[in-house]
Amino acid sequence: MDVIGRQHLRQMWDDLAEVYDKKTALIFESAQGKVRQFSYSELNEEINRAANLFHACGIKKGDHVALHLDNCPEFFFCWFGLAKIGAVMVPINARFMYEESAWIINHCQAHFVVTSDNFSPIYQPMLHDKHSPLTQLFLITENCLPTEQGVVDFLSEKAKHPVTLNHHTPLSVDDTAEILFTSGTTSQPKGVVITHYNLRFAGYYSSWQNALREDDIYLTVMPAFHIDCQCTASLPAFSVGATFVLLEKYSARAFWKQILKYQATVTECIPMMMRTLMAQPVSPDEKQHKLREVMFYLNLADEEKDAFIERFNVRLLTSYGMTETIVGLIGDRPGDKRRWPSIGRPGFCYQAQIRDKQNQQVPNGVVGEICVKGEPGKTLFKEYYNRPDATEKALEPDGWLHTGDYGYQDDEGFFYFVDRSCNMIKRGGENVSCIEIENIIASHPKIQDVAVIGVPDDIRDEAIKAFVVLVDGETLSEEAFFAFCEQNMAKFKVPSAVEFKQGLPRNCSGKVIKKHLQ
């Protein structure tokens, strides 16, 4: 079934500009509070200018162009400008340093990078490294640039180009539009190949999931280089002609005020955001919002969810997905009952099953791997870039994707997430979920954040170690910590060791990078 009508991203933006014209498409607020705003026609013009600049600089269909940027409007100018000429965007995590960024540049052979003053020191050495594929740097800067070979002043050069597209490269919805590298919390990142069809479908699917309308205002602070901001927030908002509000940085003190300021009707919160928002002083007007949906994601304890709903008077919508699924393919459906801790049911164009280690479907109620079915290159990712081995391992020929996540299904077709397979601890013959233990520990009033890992144990396969961050100003002894655990969980789940830390290493989507914990 062709859901998108063979419409690639260039056609999408030309149509949106014609249909919605002067309606506000994008509002951006910087960390300093500076606001920039673009209508649909203005945004399309900026996209065309960027496309013309890239084409004039020799970028052609199929070329890989890396974007290393914080949240900013220019990310969207470049993303869709590259798509309009058939080039491939490679977004780089804004937290990455030289080694991580260089690995991606080399792995995907990106000859071009768009970046800002903040990150240009990462790429200047690559320009002069004969072993690096990088040949040109587009620098977004307000400063006057000295003449330097290989460096282009993006803003001033873009302004010289017309607002109509100069070059119409033949495009197909099956063309690659993006290579998005996974977060690599447990291993080296893999490049997820995403097509024009994938991105157009994401807009339709996620707008259906949120029942978005053109009068909606969707606000997010998720990073633009992440699949969530792209496919769960911006594309669905644009696809229905809604207004998309992008914040540069998350501030627990400012976020709810921004919800009120922009009269947001839809937003999203990861657990870290919810916990820090709950730690803020109560404001008398915090319930005077216009939110009808708050998208939220694992991992959140029942008590935390209920407390957040009660305090802010909001309705939470959960969904489950990963970069490879493009969208939250399992989730709460529009008009459907919500049954937390269930992660919901599959949406249209998808199937889901729970399978055992022999790849056989298991009965309802039995924990196994969550496997999902879609169409590669359309409703699922196309492949891993230059990794046919990894693609074959994860993706079956008939479209079944092995997620590596454990869960189960009930008799009414609702799915429940248990944990990542790599997040299960084998302890004395028992399989122990890190998330289950983390949720219990997180319910302690003095604990702000927690992560649990398995460490080698000569007797019981693995021992359990907890890393704990306390609420500012609080103290907690090891004895009190273990006593709390013993009172609230089975003995075999009680951690053998605890380490108190000032903070936990997290990636852009809030997931703890457990390979950095020992």
From Swiss-Prot:
What UniProt keywords apply to this chain's record, in alphabetical order?
Ligase
Q: Extract one GO BP annotation from the record.
A: carnitine metabolic process
The record's similarity note reads: Belongs to the ATP-dependent AMP-binding enzyme family.
InterPro entries membership: AMP-bd_C, AMP-bd_C_sf, AMP-binding_CS, AMP-dep_synth/lig_dom, ANL_N_sf, ATP-dep_AMP-bd_enzyme, CaiC
* Organism this protein belongs to: Proteus mirabilis (strain HI4320)
> PANTHER family recorded for this chain?
LONG-CHAIN-FATTY-ACID--COA LIGASE, NONRIBOSOMAL PEPTIDE SYNTHASE PES1 (EUROFUNG)-RELATED
EC assignment: 6.2.1.48
Q: Which CDD domains match?
A: FACL_DitJ_like (cd05934)
- Briefly state the protein's biological role: Catalyzes the transfer of CoA to carnitine, generating the initial carnitinyl-CoA needed for the CaiB reaction cycle. Also has activity toward crotonobetaine and gamma-butyrobetaine.
Q: Which residues cross the membrane?
A: none
The protein here is known as: Crotonobetaine/carnitine--CoA ligase
Q: Does the keyword Cell inner membrane apply?
A: no
Q: Which reaction does it catalyse?
A: 4-(trimethylamino)butanoate + ATP + CoA = 4-(trimethylamino)butanoyl-CoA + AMP + diphosphate; crotonobetaine + ATP + CoA = crotonobetainyl-CoA + AMP + diphosphate; (R)-carnitine + ATP + CoA = (R)-carnitinyl-CoA + AMP + diphosphate
What pathway is this protein a component of?
Amine and polyamine metabolism; carnitine metabolism
**What GO molecular-function term can you cite, just one?**
carnitine-CoA ligase activity
| Disulphide bridges | none
